[in-house]
Amino acid sequence: MRRHLQWSIKQLTASYSDGQLSPRRVTEDALQDALRWKTLNAFVRLTPEQAGQQAQDAEQRYKLRQPISDLDGVTIAIKDNFCTKDVHTTCASRMLQDFVPPYDATVCSRLKQAGAVILGKTNMDQFAMGAGTVDSLYGPTKNIWSEDLNKDHWRIAGGSSGGSASAVAAGLCYAAIGSDTGGSTRNPASYCGVVGLKPTYGLVSRHGLIPLVNSMDVPGIFARSVSDCVAVLNTVAGPDKLDSTTIRQPFTRLHLPEVGQIDLSTVRIGIPKEYHCHGLSAEVLETWSKVADLLECSGASVRQVSLPNTAASIFVYTILNQCEVASNMARYDGIEYGHRATDERSTEQLYALSRAEGFNDVVKTRILTGNFLLLKKNYDHYFEKALRVRRLIAEDFARVFDSSAKEERVDILLTPTTLTEAPLYKDFASLTNRDQCAVQDFCTQPANMAGIPAVSIPIRLSQAGLPLSLQLMSNSLNEQLLLTVARWIEAQVEFDSLEHSQQYKASL
């Protein structure tokens, strides 16, 4: 066992400063472990030469006692839908299999400017359309908590950012970047027993993130602790002139209080009754209740609230998702860029065959459905109506967070992240992608619809020895309080993703 795997990012960089460890050694260990854990299929591409140079540069800065940030020399992985200069960015699809961007996504450039070591690109559902990381050109990603990684008893890692979650859970990197459109960071974080943060929409630049649903896409952060998530957020957040949707006001770095200094007496916690839904497992419900009791016993005000339009949220999300997908996928025509078919008898034939060969069935289905919903005869009935209901969903959150009646207002919402523990692949694959997303995204997509921040934190193990997590949501730009409460809960439950994971069931 590599002892530094149990350290936080702050402890790791302190060890660089005092000479206990070096960025090059940690990077070499990480690359070796990534190859040793190839069966997880967390990475689709490692970048050892680039990572080695970044680690060497960081090591030189520490020798000169001139580290440039809290992430200098820290190993990080990037989901394969973020553009990385001179490194393939494929969205796990044949359509972009040969695409090498000439520029970095803003998130990636800010990490590099901070001295982070980028290990490589992580697996995902094709074009981020999925909830299991099983619909990838490179094959499915496995969950390190699986009973057996080599037989039929392996568990999914969640999706669509399952590769990033799996890499962090296995100790292959200290943090990873994912994307979150309807829960694609929080869902795999829940299943893999790590922290997954979806920031406020517009807080982190989407420039260079290949779009799925422009109005909901948010870069997400994976780490093994809340404080590590904060370290990454402090690096990547803030206005970006290359993304007009970023919030213009300057970002104020977050500084979380020490656990012993956190006072919950003024914190109001809401329990949305609509999240007690069909399919919620008894163990998740018990976990939810116990954490609510823990918060109340520690001085927080806890009460039930109602978000009445939650029941419609998954349907509205599905409609809007498919409509925006149809629009975003139109650019992949085999002519301008992307996979190009060999049959060039006509422009129409080239266009049709390139898309037929370049997209999998999941992507094709969403494109077809989205175009159907956007037909003139359907536009008002589906798309326009979905937009109106989306506003009602956002107003539900605004009402509980901003209510003029003090007795009705709350600061934080506590809910499940996923309805169950990570399912077996064979059970997950028995349902269609559409049906799985309707189940897996139920608790997570409302935050994307409203644009508010949310974080998933692991709480305990199920009877089957698998992580169970809960989600916290708060008002827009209230990450400080959201992550403070998350840190307090984290300290009480003392969940350690590495201590219990498969990482220590095998010798490294």
Curated annotation (Swiss-Prot):
Its EC number is 6.3.5.7. Coiled coil: none annotated. It is found in: Mitochondrion. Keywords: ATP-binding, Ligase, Mitochondrion, Nucleotide-binding, Protein biosynthesis. It is an enzyme of class 6 (ligase). Pfam families: Amidase. Its main location: mitochondrion. It catalyses: L-glutamyl-tRNA(Gln) + L-glutamine + ATP + H2O = L-glutaminyl-tRNA(Gln) + L-glutamate + ADP + phosphate + H(+). GO terms for molecular function: ATP binding; glutaminyl-tRNA synthase (glutamine-hydrolyzing) activity; serine hydrolase activity. One of its GO terms (cellular component) is glutamyl-tRNA(Gln) amidotransferase complex. The active site is at K79, S160, S184. Transmembrane segments: none annotated. Disulfide bonds: none annotated. GO terms for biological process: glutaminyl-tRNAGln biosynthesis via transamidation; mitochondrial translation. PANTHER family: GLUTAMYL-TRNA(GLN) AMIDOTRANSFERASE SUBUNIT A, MITOCHONDRIAL, TRANSAMIDASE. Allows the formation of correctly charged Gln-tRNA(Gln) through the transamidation of misacylated Glu-tRNA(Gln) in the mitochondria. The reaction takes place in the presence of glutamine and ATP through an activated gamma-phospho-Glu-tRNA(Gln). Subunit of the heterotrimeric GatCAB amidotransferase (AdT) complex, composed of A, B and C subunits. Belongs to the amidase family. GatA subfamily. This is Glutamyl-tRNA(Gln) amidotransferase subunit A, mitochondrial. It comes from Drosophila melanogaster (Fruit fly). The gene is GatA.
